Amino acid sequence: MSTQQHLLMIEDDQRLADMVVTYLGNNGLSVAHCPDATSGLQQLQRQPLPDLLILDLMLPDLDGLEVCRRLRALPGAAAEVPVLMLTAKGDPMDRVVGLEMGADDYLPKP
């Protein structure tokens, strides 16, 4: 028997978030959405932790790099949540910095 995977998406573009949540939900994943960094960081301090964080780089309150840095500084298992950074920025240096800040992978937005 398989266990459903739980993801958290921190994304301020509501339309994109709705599409991702619907697509992943239709494929058997449970996805919670937070529209900003502050609510996302609060969610990451609750149990159960997500199996993956999908994190936008450009958010209205804190950027995704700062969210990633703060996540990695949290005590316990929260610091180990895998992070997939998602952004519209195409600069290769953004990828390098994102990975240095603790992201596990980095994908450009379509």
Regions found by a protein language model. Give the residues of each.
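N-terminal/domain-start alpha-helical segments
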Residues: M1-P110
